[in-house]
Amino acid sequence: VYKRQSSLSEPEAELMQQLAGRVLLVQLSGPMSFGAATGLHRRMRGYQDYDVLVLDLSDVPSIDSSATLALEEIIMTSCEAGHTVELVGIRMPVARVFARLGVLDLIRDCDRHPTRLDALRAAAENLGVATLPATDDGEPGRGAVTATSEGR
């Protein structure tokens, strides 16, 4: 979960500013085990003031079944609370575990994106937040308001 935006690309940081705290961005990294997922689940209970949860799994090479079930619980809880869930970068080994445990059925209701920037753009669109026009290089333009991104 992001407390600071230093590890975000410039376009991602600008989008987070435009979204003004309405998006909770959670980036997971490394192999996911039960302990890591339970800790995340516990920490997630402290975050309720958001509209969209972006779960970035791009840096998760593997996941065990107990961590998968904990992630499923996080997604279900978020959806039941009326939040939109955007998933980023699910790798094939992780997708296989999700499929084996039936979690793919749950995440079919979530939008899936190849990159975090794509997920943030989708969140902005879902929230009706006009994003800055793309520059010649395809990246959003400059200028944004303040934001607080929570977490990590």
Residue ranges and their predicted role:
Residues 1-2:
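Short, small-residue-biased leader/transition segments that mark boundaries at the very start
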Residues 7-152:
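Structured cytosolic domains appended to multi-pass membrane proteins
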